From Swiss-Prot:
Glycine binds at residue 233. Pathway: Cofactor biosynthesis; thiamine diphosphate biosynthesis. It catalyses: [ADP-thiazole synthase]-L-cysteine + glycine + NAD(+) = [ADP-thiazole synthase]-dehydroalanine + ADP-5-ethyl-4-methylthiazole-2-carboxylate + nicotinamide + 3 H2O + 2 H(+). The modification 2,3-didehydroalanine (Cys) is found at residue 159. Its EC number is 2.4.2.60. This is Thiamine thiazole synthase. The gene is thi4. It comes from Aeropyrum pernix (strain ATCC 700893 / DSM 11879 / JCM 9820 / NBRC 100138 / K1). GO terms for molecular function: cysteine-dependent adenosine diphosphate thiazole synthase activity; iron ion binding. The keyword Iron applies. PANTHER family: THIAMINE THIAZOLE SYNTHASE. One of its GO terms (biological process) is thiamine diphosphate biosynthetic process.
Length: 270
């Protein structure tokens, strides 16, 4: 016999115990990051390595968001300077296309970024959708979540109540949906705009500039920033996603009294 003697119940018990212990530990987190795209994973990585208890909530079964495809059906992705410094730290190889513009493999960057966030200590609830937010004393205090496939079932045949998870801070890194912020906007608690037409150069700068707290306890990062503030669409380039996630982590880290690391200067600006 090649493998150890283990039966079906042993396997199920191992999965169940691991899930239970992780979920129980993160019923109360320092930070809940909603969305496991490039901005969310970067924020989770930076906060977790600084010592924060971080939970990532992702509606899909996979992590990485749009990083798997760089545009249309093609999987090379582009990064504009100075964001390649994060690729240097992740040890993701890239090539210079022209001064200030770099190209790398999307699946490799997605895998490396997800691995780094998890290695730093962040936990993930995948196949988990945001249903609502917890607001207490005019401050976001957590999220309300459910199993993602529930939303695809007719109301007539299912009634599955969501559950609440608390956190000191929530990061809306849900991309074009900006779903966390829009839950508040639907109630008139914040204003949320619509995405403008594409303008890569302007959009990336503005996304990083506008990354921040949109409501007490809620920080918006990544393309969700463009959606909330009506910024130009940035198109298939990812530098602002990485730097926005890093900035979100730094802002929250400062509030929590944590020293959040920022990547070193780029190895190359060629």
């Amino acid at each position: 016999m090649v493998f150890a003697r283990v039966n079906e119940a042993d396997v199920t018990e191992a999965i169940l115990d691991g899930f239970y212990s992780s979920l129980k530990k993160h019923l109360r987190s320092d930070v809940i990051v909603v969305g496991a795209g490039p901005a969310g994973l970067t924020a989770a990585w930076r906060l977790a390595e600084a010592g924060a208890r971080v939970l990532i909530v992702e509606q899909n079964n996979y992590l990485g968001g749009g990083l798997w495809l760089g545009g249309y059906f093609m999987n090379p992705v582009t990064i504009r300077a100075p964001a390649q410094r994060i690729l240097d730290e992740l040890e993701v190889p890239y090539e210079a296309v022209k001064p200030g513009l770099y190209r790398t493999k999307g699946p490799l960057l997605a895998a490396k970024l997800a691995a780094r966030a998890l290695e730093a200590g962040a936990e993930v609830l995948n196949l988990t959708m945001l249903d609502d937010v917890i607001v207490e004393n005019s401050r976001v205090a957590g999220v309300v979540v459910n199993w993602s496939p529930v939303q695809g079932l007719p109301r007539q045949i299912t009634c599955v109540d969501p559950v609440g998870l608390r956190a000191e801070y929530v990061v809306d890194a849900t991309g074009h949906d900006a779903v966390v912020t829009r839950k508040l906007a639907e109630r008139g608690m914040v204003e949320a705009s619509k995405l403008g037409p594409m303008w890569v150069e302007r959009s990336e700068d503005l996304v990083v500039e506008k990354t921040g707290e949109v409501y007490p306890g809620l920080v918006v990062a990544g393309i969700a920033v463009a959606e909330v503030y009506g910024l130009p669409r940035m198109g298939p380039t990812f530098g602002a996603m990485l730097l926005s996630g890093e900035k979100a982590a730094a802002l929250i880290g400062e509030k929590l009294g944590l020293k959040v690391k920022v990547a070193a200067a780029p190895a190359s600006q060629a």
